């Protein structure tokens, strides 16, 4: 996607353990044959998520960067996105033909959002295991992200969560904004997320 700042930048946020890194991994592996991709992860004091993506073979190591945010992880994607913007600029310098940069936030709360300066599209991941009340609690991630991903639907019977309630609440809180129910462990719902990024982000498939 040719924008004034180069590649399409997709922010992936959500609470710790919701499946953000799993989604990053799957998106890289699914889309890398068709697009020129880089990935940036945010961790407070380590580069664990970036290292996971390298070990998993999501992309070649030179296409994966880890940002150590220190302190408050959501500041690095919102109030002061300079470290992430620098990481994006570095990737663009290395790979001038980049189509897509995926940016994973550090584990954050329901109030964390990406700066529009940093992300063109935002995906917010929550998981069923955290309880079926999560969509009704609102917060910018739930209500204003471009796409809400409700992950780990396979766990619903084990944690007594109602998927129907989660769908109803998500629809009520988000209005016309889309959401997807997923089991990323089995790639269920992944095609809809990829389709959303391609359509909403205006990506043109190579070849």
Swiss-Prot record:
Disulfide links within the chain: none
Record-level GO cellular component terms: cytoplasm
The coiled-coil segments of this chain are: none
The answer to keyword Mitochondrion applying to this record is: no
Per UniProt, which keywords does this protein have? Chaperone, Cytoplasm, GTP-binding, Nickel insertion, Nucleotide-binding
* Principal location: cytoplasm
A molecular function (GO) term: GTPase activity
Compartments annotated for it: namely: Cytoplasm
Q: Give the record's GO biological process terms.
A: urea catabolic process
Specify the superkingdom.
Bacteria
Binding residues for GTP, per the UniProt record? 14-21
The record describes its quaternary structure and partners as: Homodimer. UreD, UreF and UreG form a complex that acts as a GTP-hydrolysis-dependent molecular chaperone, activating the urease apoprotein by helping to assemble the nickel containing metallocenter of UreC. The UreE protein probably delivers the nickel.
Recorded hits in PANTHER family, A to Z, give: UREASE ACCESSORY PROTEIN G (PTHR31715:SF0)
Q: Record's family?
A: Belongs to the SIMIBI class G3E GTPase family. UreG subfamily.
Q: What does this protein do?
A: Facilitates the functional incorporation of the urease nickel metallocenter. This process requires GTP hydrolysis, probably effectuated by UreG.
Protein name in the entry: Urease accessory protein UreG
Q: What is the lineage of its organism?
A: Bacteria, Pseudomonadati, Pseudomonadota, Alphaproteobacteria, Hyphomicrobiales
- Gene name, Swiss-Prot/TrEMBL: ureG
